[in-house]
Curated annotation (Swiss-Prot):
GO molecular function: rRNA binding; structural constituent of ribosome
Principal subcellular localization: plastid
Protein name as catalogued: Small ribosomal subunit protein uS19c
Transmembrane segments: none
Function: Protein S19 forms a complex with S13 that binds strongly to the 16S ribosomal RNA.
One GO location term (cellular component): mitochondrial small ribosomal subunit
NCBIfam families according to UniProt: rpsS_bact
Locations listed in the record: Plastid, Chloroplast
Family: Belongs to the universal ribosomal protein uS19 family.
Pfam family, one: Ribosomal_S19
Record's keyword terms, sorted: Chloroplast, Plastid, Ribonucleoprotein, Ribosomal protein, RNA-binding, rRNA-binding
Length: 92
């Protein structure tokens, strides 16, 4: 089920607090977070947020087109190596 519109989007408290402090100081620095479920809200535009993918933090520059999406959507967690090459000897 989708989240109720009257409740608003989920954003981790530490993330909101840090972004608001940076906006007040008019600074832009890298913000690291493990909160992949946090939604991107308009106050995040212009910030770079490093989101954890299970192994490392990958930086994401937030633009206006990302508003409404989740942070985890922009960081892939799985590493696809490709299918095995055609090996006719292994078929039999």
């Amino acid at each position: 089920m989708a989240r109720s519109s009257k409740r608003g989007p989920f954003v981790a408290n530490h993330l909101i607090r840090e972004i608001r402090n940076l906006n007040i100081q008019k600074k832009r620095k890298l913000i690291t977070t493990w909160s992949r479920a946090s939604a991107i809200v308009p106050i995040m535009i212009g910030h770079t947020i490093a989101v954890h993918n299970g192994r490392e933090h990958l930086p994401i520059y937030v633009t206006d087109r990302m508003v409404g999406h989740k942070l985890g959507e922009f960081v892939p967690t799985r590493n696809f190596r490709g299918h095995a090459k055609s090996d006719k000897g292994s078929r039999r």
